[in-house]
Design a protein with these regions (language model features):
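Non-catalytic, solvent-exposed segments at the cell envelope interface
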Residues: 1-264
Length: 264
């Protein structure tokens, strides 16, 4: 049902540089890296750019989930040879293993798990959940229909053009197009839209009955590559209402939007 990554060894992800204090503070938390890749086919491994990079921190006692987006253009040490590049190059070059190692090394974390999805998986999940309600600004509306057309073409999932700015009920493809928008502002604003779509979708999932949750799992899980097994997921899926999304933020907070190199 779920594409479990057999090449990903969790014990390799132990961060040797983490302080004892930090390790103590992280007890009782489950930290998972979420990668959204912009594949134009169904592939999710290396060779794809990670468009979405979110660190998901779950407090296993309280059920609070914190989401922190890493801006994909953040310059970090992306490999163990001190090579600095835009962070999404880590996933492109070395897949989830290199990306998780880079997050741990640069951000002083100990992430042992990850899940990677492509846009079709997100669109399918939101369609099963019945869509989400979003207020579109005029600038967002100006660009969204081009993204809808492109996302329909790359996923093969049907949708239609939106008619106006303001309150809109978005289907899966339209919600993905909204999360992908960036031409009229920055990656900072884009990651806020991504987290908004995750929050709205998660709220729908929490309210859904078990047959809907089961349908999401059956349709979406085969499209996800992950170090997490079904045994990890099923207890949480049966007890979804105890989880809630708390703080969400973008990293780094220092918002110097400097263009690097010719491509920017």
């Amino acid at each position: 049902l779920m594409q479990t990554d057999t090449e990903f060894n969790k014990s390799d992800m132990t961060n040797p540089y983490i302080s004892v204090e930090k390790e103590q503070a992280m007890k009782g938390y489950w930290t998972v890296a979420l990668f959204g890749v912009d594949s134009r086919d169904s592939s999710v491994g290396k060779g794809n750019m990670s468009d979405v990079i979110i660190i998901c921190n779950i407090n296993q006692e309280t059920g609070e989930i914190k989401l922190v987006s890493l801006f994909r253009d953040t310059y970090l040490n992306v490999d163990d040879k001190n090579g600095y590049n835009k962070f999404n190059q880590a996933y492109f070059r070395g897949g989830p293993k290199q990306a998780v190692e880079a997050l741990n090394r640069n951000l002083d974390l100990e992430i042992n798990d990850y899940a990677t999805f492509n846009w079709k998986a997100v669109a399918d999940a939101i369609n099963i959940l019945g869509g989400v309600d979003v207020e579109l600004s005029k600038a967002e509306f100006y660009y969204i229909n081009a993204y809808i057309t492109e996302t329909v073409e790359s996923t093969g999932v049907g949708s239609y053009q939106l008619k106006s700015a303001g309150p809109n009920h978005l289907d899966g493809i339209q919600a993905v197009a909204y999360a992908r928008l960036r031409k009229m502002d920055t990656d900072f604003a884009r990651t806020e839209r991504q987290r908004k779509i995750i929050q709205l979708s998660f709220d729908k999932l929490r309210q859904a009955n078990f047959s809907v949750v089961n349908n999401v799992m059956e349709v979406v899980f085969p499209q996800i590559l992950s170090s997490i097994t079904l045994d990890d997921v099923i207890p949480a899926a049966k007890n979804l209402t105890r989880y809630h999304i708390g703080d969400t933020a973008g990293f780094p907070e220092a918002r110097s939007d400097a263009n690097m190199g010719k491509k920017g």
